[in-house]
A protein has these predicted regions:
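Basic, polyanion-binding surface patches
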Residues: 1-166
Length: 166
């Protein structure tokens, strides 16, 4: 299929969203420990920036319940979900209310205080270094303080569906 080229001077956000649906991304649960409890949300906007120092980028909608806690705590954990964790992804994407999300799954506490998912494909415990507001989202650049990985394949999201490498 040929690529559709925009004809208007400004790209329509709907066209952009439709094109982005054709990309694939790992499915992650971003967690943060706050004074009044643990908070978390499902996110696909996560990528590495550099290995020296180990640095990652996440982007979250400013309307997300996690937003204020990330700003206050300035640390978070990226839990890369395993390929068999579709239900967990849905729990943290809003199927369960925030106060019920952590009770359904096994977690351990990192030295930073952040909750880490026992059954993750990989994890990154991070400290915020830079913040930038871009449209509706907060872009966070963070240095990785601790990371781990398992032999389990990650859960992927593309074109509105969960999947994994064949």
């Amino acid at each position: 299929h040929a690529l559709e080229r925009p004809t208007a001077p400004l790209l329509d956000p709907t066209a952009f969203k439709q094109a982005m649906r054709n990309t694939a991304a790992s499915v992650n649960v971003i967690t943060c420990a706050a004074d009044d409890g643990d908070y978390g949300m499902t996110a696909t906007a996560f990528t590495s920036i550099t290995a020296d120092p180990p640095t990652v980028l996440i982007a979250i909608n400013q309307s997300a319940s996690l937003h204020a806690h990330l700003l206050a705590q300035r640390r978070f954990c990226v839990n890369v979900l395993r390929a068999d964790a579709q239900e967990l992804a849905s729990d943290f994407a809003g199927r369960l209310p925030p106060e019920q999300r952590f009770g359904e799954h096994a977690w351990h506490r990192l030295p930073s205080g952040n909750p880490a998912l026992e059954a993750s494909s990989a994890g990154f415990d991070c400290e915020v270094r830079e913040l930038s507001q871009v449209g509706s989202h907060l872009v966070i650049i963070a240095e990785v303080q601790h990371c781990w990985h398992s032999a389990h394949a990650p859960l992927l999201y593309s074109n509105g569906r969960y999947g994994q490498f064949a």
